[in-house]
UniProtKB/Swiss-Prot annotation:
GO terms for cellular component: cytosol. PANTHER family: DNA MISMATCH REPAIR PROTEIN MSH1, MITOCHONDRIAL, DNA MISMATCH REPAIR PROTEIN MUTS FAMILY MEMBER. InterPro entries: DNA_mismatch_repair_MutS, DNA_mismatch_repair_MutS-lik_N, DNA_mismatch_repair_MutS/MSH, DNA_mismatch_repair_MutS_C, DNA_mismatch_repair_MutS_clamp, DNA_mismatch_repair_MutS_core, DNA_mismatch_repair_MutS_N, DNA_mismatch_repair_MutS_sf. The lineage of its organism: Bacteria, Pseudomonadati, Pseudomonadota, Gammaproteobacteria, Alteromonadales. It comes from Shewanella sp. (strain ANA-3). ATP binds at G618, P619, N620, M621, G622, G623, K624, S625. This is DNA mismatch repair protein MutS. Belongs to the DNA mismatch repair MutS family. It holds the Pfam family MutS_III. The gene is mutS. GO terms for molecular function: ATP binding; ATP-dependent DNA damage sensor activity; damaged DNA binding; mismatched DNA binding.
């Protein structure tokens, strides 16, 4: 049966009618339906939950004549199951009992009180501590895309206007959202195929006017001019859909979402999706974090600092003034060793950014308040440390930290030192904070003394030495005696419970005291919850300032971390230049040098206006790819304000970094390895500029030798002569080493190796000039290819080389043609239809002539 079919509700029991009605309202997610101590799932939800969570699938009688599939989880274990579900992109609606079973006629009143989706998480137990948790929305216009992201756990709201699919793909790669909303007519689904949490939304949710009204209401402004986004129409439509979705799922005010910013690609170095993937910035090729740039650079003290660092890595700055401000701050922290004390102080702050989001949503727990109190207690100490520093950026961050003496004192008075996890059972508000609460608690807490006195008195009165007075949650207070002595109890003892060897009684006096104590406990708990709610009202007026404190602390953490990494890993401060070029002395790969079992061989690189392209040759396993990647990573690190693994680095203006390194089949899109390679190459050739850094590795491998050589030659020629980009072009086509002889600005470099008999030693050192050979057979031998195969390969290689010397490049006269002649592209021939079109004057054509001309153009094309 389909559980959202509510046409025949009368066939079902009252409880199942209630369930089916709620399920119809939340048909696109699992419904956790609270029944006593369990959350139950029925019908298809039960089957899916059983499959996803590995829980038992049973049946609950019949309703409407059919057995009801059912699965359940204990309420106290729900967070663990929710974590599993959101990790695989599943959303859950949580339906609680809000009525009293004792007074309910028919099914207990229930209500969906919480919706958990991957992109709207704020609960600490469900979030990845050191990763942003982004909800995204994308809207496709006639030209371009609108893209919006929101981190509900911090309030960070960002939009971007993107002109092409490639730009959207790069943004998806950069932001890596855990949940994506898209419109019904979205036409680029191939870009979303590997994302788990995809949600198709109706077209009307992207309506422009509705979106503007939603955003104005959220920010409390008359217009959006102050945010500088009024012309970002498509992304505002995406932002409106996203905002509505968050309101629907959170079902509460969202005061921490109080601003929206626009991501402009012109402010940062553009990294396309392939580049982010190939450089393994925050995610390795296997999808993990090990052996990535972030893993090496991240020794931050706080989770919010770690998340900010990863955002910086994906958004290298172009503005040298901003970079220099960061560098100056890092340099001062390093020289004064202030980074050491700052690290310890920041570590004690905790994740204030996410705590403030939970406070805004009123879902914060007692320990969140305790952590906030601890952070505010540390502020004076942190301010004192910063007072010794004079770098302008550090001073600015110190001012943003702010001061919160009233909030600190409030939390000190209100919250106990070590509060429980939940407010549910009380014990959170400190004694002395509220006189009425202390009075009610006094009645309850005095029960222990009273019970001791009552037990002694009753033992003496009855003569039963083993008599005990106790309490449990089910039966309340009781007097317990053994079965054998039950004949001796006084007449005013009323039997309350019979056990195997014991009888339990209550007296009118004890009953009266029980009611008094339980009443005081209930009143104390109710008052404590009221005081707890009031704490939110007292703290939230400073929400914006506390959010600024969190952001400033996170940035201080990143800068302090850069200083520590520079000291620990031997990094130097890169120099920024206004002249185009990249000069690195003794550069090292930041990741490889950390994981290598042998000392890393440092290498230089020099690129400038007169030396724009390096043809990189050398043996397989010689280190060409490592060398190229380290140049890109050092350049990127310099543009986030980080020191770099080199003796010296001088970096000029960079607008984009492109990489065409490695490839594999894109099965989901039906593209072969060669097609992927050519697509990435086309993107580079179309978009690279004279200020771009381009890494091209082994272009043309996936096709025939001459096809591949032709493509590699032409791509290198185009980059060198038409684009003028700073390029490292690695190849095994030795014909390309002739390029420096044919065009200015192109130079050969190679990675060296030493051959001795049948063995080879890789030197990993970059030398000027072209390599002499590729050593492919020696590498094959190292890989364990059988000796017979290697021997046969040597024989075949000798045959091929002999034939090539005789045949390759021979023309009709038997002379060898120059390689540039062989590979030169033919002059383009203009299409006859285009020539005809150029001669047409449309203003002089009659309708009949225009129609005849259309047929002629069709024939010519």
């Amino acid at each position: 049966m389909n559980p959202i079919d509510t046409d025949d509700l009368e066939k079902h029991t009252p409880m199942m009618r209630q369930y089916l009605t709620m399920k119809a309202e939340h048909h696109d997610m699992l419904l956790f339906y609270r029944m006593g101590d369990f959350y139950e799932l029925f019908y298809d939800d039960a089957k899916r939950a059983s499959e996803l969570l590995g829980i038992s699938l049973t049946a609950r009688g019949k309703s409407g004549g059919d057995p009801i599939p059912m699965a359940g989880i204990p309420y106290h274990a729900v967070e663990g199951y929710l974590a599993k579900l959101v990790q695989i992109g599943q959303s859950v609606a949580i339906c609680e009992q809000i009525g009293d079973p004792a007074t309910s006629k028919g099914p207990v009143e229930r209500k969906v009180v919480r919706i958990v989706t991957p992109g709207t998480l704020t609960d600490e137990a469900l979030l990845q501590e050191r990763q942003d948790n982004l909800l995204a929305a994308v809207y496709q216009g006639k030209v371009g895309f609108g893209y919006a992201t929101l981190d509900v756990s911090s309030g960070r709201f960002v939009i971007a206007e993107l002109e092409t699919k490639e730009s959207l793909e790069a943004e998806l790669q950069r932001t890596n959202p855990v949940e994506i909303l898209y419109s019904e007519d979205f036409g680029a689904m191939e870009l979303l195929h590997h994302f788990k949490g995809k949600r198709r939304r109706p077209e009307w949710e992207f309506d422009y006017d509705t979106s503007i009204k939603l955003l104005l209401a959220q920010f409390g402004t008359k217009d959006l001019h102050g945010f500088g986004i009024t012309d970002a129409r498509l992304s505002l439509q995406a932002a409106g859909c996203l905002m509505q979705y968050v309101k629907d799922t959170q079902r509460t005010a969202l005061p921490h979402i109080n601003a929206i910013t626009r991501f402009n690609q012109t402010d940062t170095i553009v990294l396309d999706a392939a580049t982010r993937r190939n450089l393994e910035l925050t995610q390795n090729l296997s999808g993990g974090r090990d052996n990535t740039l972030a893993a090496v650079l991240d020794n931050t003290a706080t989770a919010m600092g770690s998340r900010m660092l990863q955002r910086w890595i994906h958004q290298p700055l172009r503005d040298h003034a901003q970079i220099f401000a960061r560098q100056t701050a890092v340099n001062e922290l390093l020289e004064t060793t202030a980074h050491e004390s700052l690290h310890d102080q920041l570590k004690a702050l905790g994740d204030i950014e996410r705590i403030m989001a939970r406070l805004a949503l009123r879902t914060a727990r007692p320990r969140d308040f305790a952590r906030l109190r601890q952070a505010l207690n540390l502020l004076p100490q942190l301010q004192q440390s910063l007072a010794q520093l004079s770098a302008p950026h550090t001073v600015k961050l110190g001012q943003l930290l702010g001061e919160f003496p009233e909030e600190q004192q409030l939390l000190e008075r209100a919250i106990v030192d070590n509060p429980p996890m939940l407010i549910r059972d009380g014990g959170v508000i400190r004694e002395g904070y509220n006189a009425e609460l202390d009075e009610w608690r006094g009645l309850s807490e005095g029960a222990t003394d009273y019970l001791v006195q009552l037990e002694a008195r009753e033992k003496e009165r009855t003569g039963i030495a083993t008599l005990k007075v106790g309490y449990n949650r089910v039966h309340g207070y009781y007097i317990e005696v053994s079965r054998l002595q039950s004949q001796q109890v006084p007449l005013n003892y009323q039997r309350r419970q019979t056990l195997k060897n014991m009888e339990r009684y209550i007296t009118p006096e004890l009953k009266e005291y029980e009611e008094k104590v339980l009443s005081s406990q209930g009143k104390a708990l109710a008052l404590e919850k009221q005081l707890w709610d009031e704490l939110f009202d007292l703290i939230l007026p400073k929400l914006h300032e506390l959010q600024a404190f969190a952001r400033a602390a996170a940035e201080l953490d990143v800068l302090s971390n850069f200083a520590e990494r520079a000291e620990t890993l031997g990094y130097t401060c890169p120099e920024l230049s206004s002249e185009i070029g990249v000069k690195i002395e003794a550069g090292r790969h930041p990741v490889v040098e950390r994981v290598s079992q042998t000392p890393f061989i440092a290498n230089p690189v020099t690129l400038h206006n007169q030396r724009r392209m390096l043809i990189v040759t050398g043996p397989n396993m010689g280190g060409k790819s490592t060398y190229m990647r380290q140049v890109a990573l050092i350049t990127l690190m310099a543009h986030i304000g980080c020191f770099v693994p080199a003796d010296r680095a001088i970096i000029g203006p960079i607008d984009r970094i492109f990489t065409r390194i490695g490839a594999s089949d894109d099965l989901a899109s039906g593209r072969s390895t060669f097609m992927v390679e050519m697509t990435e190459t086309a993107n580079i050739l179309h978009n690279a500029t004279a200020q771009s850094l381009v890494l091209m590795d082994e272009i043309g491998r996936g096709t025939s030798t001459y096809d591949g050589l032709s493509l590699a030659w032409s791509a290198a020629e185009y980059l060198a002569q038409q684009v003028g980009a700073m390029t490292l072009f690695a190849t095994h086509y030795f014909e390309l080493t002739q390029l420096p002889e044919l065009m200015a600005g192109v130079y050969n470099v190679h990675l060296d190796a030493i051959e001795h008999e049948d063995t080879i030693a890789f030197m990993h050192a970059v030398q000027e000039g072209a390599a002499s050979k590729s050593y492919g057979l020696q590498v094959a031998a190292l890989a364990g290819v059988p000796a017979r195969v290697i021997k046969a390969a040597k024989h075949k290689l000798h045959q091929l080389e002999s034939r090539d010397h005789q045949v390759e490049g021979a023309n009709v006269n038997g002379t060898r043609a120059p390689i540039q002649t062989l590979l030169a592209l033919p002059e383009p021939v203009e299409n006859p239809a285009v020539s005809k079109l150029k001669d047409i004057n449309p203003d002089n054509l009659t309708p009949k002539q225009a129609l005849d001309l259309l047929y002629e153009l069709k024939r010519l094309s």
